């Protein structure tokens, strides 16, 4: 079977959530046939060493960036005057319906590729990218819905920290998609979703739950071990280039961490991962008990030293990999209701996880776990087996195989 995988996320490096998902999808698809990678990204955004690794380890057959919103429609006439300003204005004001039309840069490149190479199936990540390809959804085309624009905009409306303008803007964008997106989903041969509840989204009633696999570190995971009873270390891992992570971190630092330190004066909060601007990192570094570590060689030692981890996320789409990783390393996680989405079937609030909404409740959950080592260890021990089972590569690859075999039988 010859498979064309189209994605906007490079499969390397895998310390970023979207990249990790792309790499694991390619790995699962490769168990069913030959996989060609078409990367819908700007080559200038890829550091040369990263691109070299991608070319070395994957069958890269195309690298073309979709046009920016400022390059489409009437915006394109004004863009030469001030590209940066026009792109930002178009991101705020351009109709979101245009995101679901064949892209003037991407579609011709893919048309040429598919004229030269016979593919048995196309797998594409994200509805907007799939529609930009110009490939007929009934090719057969498997749509990998790892996040949805509807969920993203809805989360911005529901975010307790969102201002009036942000909520109104998100509501306007959501209204543009309400009538057109469900019909587009229904045109595809098959849709994969990352969370079981995503099948409740209009248009995805026929979707198959694919989920995501946990990418185990080289050398494997350490055996489940209790946390150090004396540990007062709390950690958050993520890429802070990703806005939901940066906003969630800021919410925790401003509204929750002072309450935790007031009750547990020796508590330490480690912020791990790339993407914080130097001014923001410097400001956080002045917060008592907070340590900005940035990118670290290995996350293992920090999980070993911490009492538990955090996922204070309020916006976005898809699923929070940081929750899965925490349990894989044997540490419980304190989550917001939004970060809990996708884990309802394997983590139970109060028995294997702590879900808290208000700043006061979130702080209380952290304080209680810092003071009760036995409880945090019970939560981790109860959650780890279910998480590793539901998010195993074997289950994930099995769903991929069943889908492609079913499509092949219809051809």
Regions found by a protein language model. Give the residues of each.
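Conserved nucleotide-sugar donor-binding subdomain of glycosyltransferases
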Residues: 75-130, 165-188
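Donor nucleotide-sugar binding/catalytic pocket of nucleotide-sugar-dependent glycosyltransferases
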Residues: 142-143, 150, 170-221
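N-terminal subdomain of nucleotide-sugar transferases
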Residues: 1-64, 117
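Acidic donor-binding loop of glycosyltransferase active sites
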Residues: 189, 301-318, 329-332
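A charged, aromatic-enriched C-terminal amphipathic alpha-helix characteristic of glycosyltransferases
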Residues: 101, 374-404
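Short hydrophobic beta-strand element within catalytic cores of glycosyltransferases
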Residues: 322-326, 332-339
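Conserved catalytic-core segment of nucleotide-activated headgroup transferases in glycan assembly
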Residues: 21, 209-305
């Amino acid at each position: 079977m010859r498979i064309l995988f189209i994605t906007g996320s490079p499969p390397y490096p895998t310390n970023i959530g979207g990249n990790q998902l792309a790499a694991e999808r390619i790995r699962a698809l490769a168990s069913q046939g030959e996989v060609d990678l078409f990367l819908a990204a700007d080559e200038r955004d890829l550091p040369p060493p990263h691109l070299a690794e991608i070319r070395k380890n994957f069958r890269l057959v195309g690298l073309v960036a979709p046009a920016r919103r400022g390059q489409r429609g009437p915006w394109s006439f004004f863009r030469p005057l001030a590209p940066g300003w026009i792109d930002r204005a178009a991101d705020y004001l351009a109709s979101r319906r245009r995101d679901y039309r064949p892209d003037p840069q991407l579609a011709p490149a893919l048309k040429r590729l598919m004229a030269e190479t016979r593919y048995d199936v196309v797998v594409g990540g994200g509805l907007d990218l799939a529609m930009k390809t110009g490939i007929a959804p009934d090719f057969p085309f498997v749509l990998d819905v790892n996040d949805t624009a509807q969920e993203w905009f809805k989360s911005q409306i529901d975010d307790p920290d969102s201002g009036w303008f942000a909520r109104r803007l998100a509501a306007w964008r959501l209204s543009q998609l309400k009538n057109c997106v469900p019909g587009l989903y229904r045109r595809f041969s098959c849709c994969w979703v990352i969370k079981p509840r995503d099948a409740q989204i209009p248009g995805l009633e026929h979707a198959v739950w694919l989920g995501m696999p946990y990418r185990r570190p080289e050398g494997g995971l350490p055996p489940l071990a209790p946390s150090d009873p004396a540990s007062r270390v709390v950690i958050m891992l993520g890429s802070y280039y990703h806005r939901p992570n940066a906003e969630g971190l800021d919410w925790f630092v401003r509204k929750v961490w002072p309450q935790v330190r007031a009750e547990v004066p020796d508590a330490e909060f480690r912020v791990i991962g790339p993407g914080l601007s130097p001014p923001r990192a410097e400001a956080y570094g002045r917060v008592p008990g907070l340590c900005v570590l940035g990118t670290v060689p290995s996350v293992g030692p920090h999980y070993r030293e911490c009492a538990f981890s955090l996922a204070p996320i309020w916006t976005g789409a898809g699923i929070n990999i940081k929750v899965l990783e925490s349990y894989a390393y044997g540490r419980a996680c304190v989550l917001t209701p939004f970060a809990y989405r996708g884990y309802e079937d394997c983590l139970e609030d109060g028995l294997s996880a702590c879900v808290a909404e208000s700043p006061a409740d979130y702080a209380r959950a952290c304080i209680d776990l810092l003071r009760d080592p036995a409880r945090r260890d019970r939560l981790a021990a109860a959650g780890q087996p279910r998480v590793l089972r539901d998010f195993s590569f074997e289950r994930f690859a099995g769903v991929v195989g069943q889908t492609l075999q079913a499509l092949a039988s219809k051809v």
